[in-house]
Amino acid sequence: MRITRTEYLNKLIAFKDKQLIKVVTGIRRCGKSVLMEMYQDWLLQNGVEQDQIIAINFEDMDFEELTDYRKLYAYLKDRLVPEKMTYIFLDEIQHVTDFPKVIDSLYIKKNVDIYATGSNAYMLSSEIATLISGRYVQIEMLPLSFKEYMQSTGSMEDRGIKYTEYLENSSFPYALELKGHPNEIRDYLDGIFNTIVVKDILTRRKILDPLMLKSVLRYVFDNIGSPLSSKKIADTLTSEGRKVDVKTVERYLDALIESYIIYPAQRYNVKGKQYLKTLGKYYVVDIGMRFMLLGKRNTDAGHILENVVYLELLRRGYDVYVGKVDSFEVDFVAMNGNSTFYYQVALSVRDADTLQRELRPLLSIRDHYPKYILTMDDDPEEQYDGIRRINARDWLLGLTD
């Protein structure tokens, strides 16, 4: 089953033939390679000839010798089509030594359109980004959204059941092929997890204590949506008999963020319009992977919903922060250009005290930006002093204004 990732595909189409390097980043197995294949199919259906497309996956042994940047450049240069646009696809390019040199040399040639993918943020770290600064656009890819998951099942009915499936079966695209086979899904997710830990983190970062790395990751997975600091993690693990210092925890967190397995949400002072350095939160790329690592017993449905909403806001192109308003906290402040949106996320607000608790931070914000409470309650939409309470599943499916 090949799931059409329409929103990502449209982004690539919009940048076709533009003098920008298109860089698609995201966790392993989120669908980057399939997206590239779909885009190549689209090109062929829209007047591009096969010889104008050069596609290389650097995790394929057939191309192993091309991980040397000189050989790669020679290979590509020999295959450029004179007087026509050549579309170059470089999948998992982080395996190529000094790859920016290749991209830089190709970029200055006429009629070359470059697309690259990578499974860790290191490929766009400061020194690399400097070499291609101002000449690339980054498209950040995530596993399936709830809407994509629903569409891939062929029906938009039974939203409640499918939401549970979406969480438990995983949002990684191939997990749909394994639906109904929980042991196979677990093995599949375990394989992704171990590849990330071994290939993308331990080997490249030269980390010598894989058990401690996994302990840090488990702690973050177990505390999604809770304020965390490196010191708090270090103190907790040390008190449990696994001694670790703050600097090591910081290094491990950086590596996990770089591999797209966890995402940080920095705190933001809404009234002072300042970014705060302390007690941010972390969210995981896939709840199914969290279940795999921690077990189903760790349900924590409220924070799981919060995690799903956070990822959806990222998909929609927002920078997402945890809001601080006086002594109150707003779950999410979502910013994009001049637009700002505020979100509270709760399983239910049918209880009057819970509703007031969720409303209070939003009512404390004295601006005119939209404010929402997202809840799993199936009650009709309601407004409280301009604050909209809407069903979270409807919001995830794009069924609300």
Residue ranges and their predicted role:
Residues I3-D17:
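Pre-Walker A adenine-sensing motif
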Residues K32:
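Conserved lysine of the Walker
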Residues L35:
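Hydrophobic positions on the alpha1 helix immediately C-terminal to the Walker A/P-loop
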Residues V24:
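Hydrophobic anchor at the beta1->P-loop junction of P-loop NTPases
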Residues D378-D401:
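Domain-level recognition of nuclease-like catalytic cores that cleave nucleotide substrates
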Residues G180-T340:
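Accessory nucleic acid-recognition modules appended to NTPase machines
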Residues S119-A121, S125-P227, Y260-Y263:
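Interdomain motor-coupling "hinge/lid" segment immediately C-terminal to the ATP-binding subdomain
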Residues A55-E83:
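Short glycine-rich substrate-engagement loop in P-loop NTPases that contacts/grips substrate
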